[in-house]
Amino acid sequence: MQFQEKEFLPVILGADITAYSLARSFHEEYGIKSLVLSMSEGGYIANSDIIENRIFPGLENKDVLVKHLIEVGKEFEGKKKLIVLGCGDWYVRALIESKKELSPYYIIPY
């Protein structure tokens, strides 16, 4: 499978069908691979070639989520624009509440 190199990278929170759907949409439109942050290896995103899944236990805790998002943000700082999307109300709420801490690293469309 051929992937395009773009100036942005979708960072998707969660491992459900919505995460897969978002990753697939980005892949179909831009030919890119999405980065998914999840708490598990299985589910709809397992073995997908269009997703890089990074597993972080404890993402249901907002402080843990923000910590890992900042780590990932620093990893790509100056290399790619990161667009973070939450799959589920809880993730979206956490992103909105943490916008100040995360906005140096991410585009947060909420």
Residue ranges and their predicted role:
Residues 1-110:
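ATP-binding N-terminal substructure of ATP-dependent carboxylate-amine bond-forming enzymes
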